[in-house]
A protein has these predicted regions:
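Class I S-adenosyl-L-methionine-dependent methyltransferase catalytic core
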Residues: 1-165
Length: 165
């Protein structure tokens, strides 16, 4: 779920790849690891009668992939009243504090009325993993989550500097 310009991971699906037609579990077996997505919250769109976006389609595909194995981690806005909200997830960790997002590099306002802003809303980390044995529901402070993220980035940089990653 990327335009490739804003990718944060070395392996990703673009709209041309259509993640909703891919076998994520096979890809995870190939690369060894877990999947992360911050999916688009846009309405469903289709290409040749096949969904390419839409959170409900994405959550349905995540559930299907969960059954095939693997860990699928999503950063989602909290929208428990929406039909796509993932009550079937194995773990939901609500983030205390609003989450902000950067405007994509490619975004060009159509006019002066279209002011670019990052979204700020309640978020949750949602995990689909049938081997999950932790709590079903939990909470984390945004500041704690940010610190964990910074630690992972530093570890990744260290591994790269050692030629390991």
């Amino acid at each position: 779920f990327t335009d490739a310009q804003n990718s944060k991971c070395p392996h990703f699906y673009t709209v041309e790849d259509n993640a909703l037609t891919q076998d994520w579990s096979e890809k995870l077996k190939e690369i060894g690891g877990s999947a992360f997505a911050n999916p688009p919250y846009s309405r469903s769109s289709y290409h040749e009668k096949q969904a390419v976006t839409g959170v409900r389609h994405i959550m349905n595909h995540a559930l299907a992939m969960r059954e095939k194995g693997g860990r699928y981690v999503f950063l989602l806005k909290v929208a428990t009243s929406e039909t796509w909200w993932c009550e079937e997830a194995d773990h939901i960790c609500f983030i205390r504090g609003r989450v902000g997002f950067d405007v994509p590099q490619w975004f060009v306002p159509a006019d002066e009325n279209q002011v670019p802003t990052g979204a700020f809303f309640a978020g949750a980390i949602v995990v689909f993993d049938k081997t999950w044995n932790g709590k079903a529901i939990d909470y984390i402070q945004r500041s704690e989550l940010e610190q964990i993220g910074k630690t992972f980035v530093e570890q990744a940089k260290w591994l790269v500097s050692r030629g390991v990653a």
